[in-house]
Amino acid sequence: MILVRNSFQLKFGKAKDVKAIIKDGLTKLKAPGLHEHRAYLDLTGPFYTLVLENTWDSMAAFEKALADLGANAEWQAWYAKLMPLVESGHREIYTVIS
């Protein structure tokens, strides 16, 4: 099993807007091999940070979901709402050991 963590630095003052978009978007993220997903906004650390975490059966399941979501018009429309509110981001992928 793997854990994928996507961290985004949001534009200043946009956390409230992003929160509504994320709540809507998590309902669209359904894929084979996906176990759970969570979204976090910062309490400490760099201001206006959004973290999206999800766990997958395997790297292959995650890669397939990326390809499938990229071809999904509903997901593309949701993503287009989110990206103007984001300054930058990065992804970390971990092997789950317990």
Per-region residue spans from a language model:
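Absolute protein N-terminus
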Residues: 1-2, 98
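Active-site-flanking beta-strand signature of metal-NTP-handling nucleotidyl enzymes
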Residues: 2-8
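Broad gene-expression machinery/nucleic-acid interaction feature
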Residues: 5, 49-51, 88
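Short hydrophobic/aromatic beta-strand micro-patches
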Residues: 9, 53-55
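Short, surface-exposed ligand-recognition loops at beta-strand->loop->(often short) alpha-helix junctions
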Residues: 9-20
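An amphipathic, aromatic/His-enriched active-site/gating alpha helix that lines ligand/cofactor pockets
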Residues: 20-38, 55-93
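N-terminal secretory/targeting leader peptides
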Residues: 40-42
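Short acidic/glycine-enriched loop/turn segments that link adjacent beta-strands
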Residues: 44-48
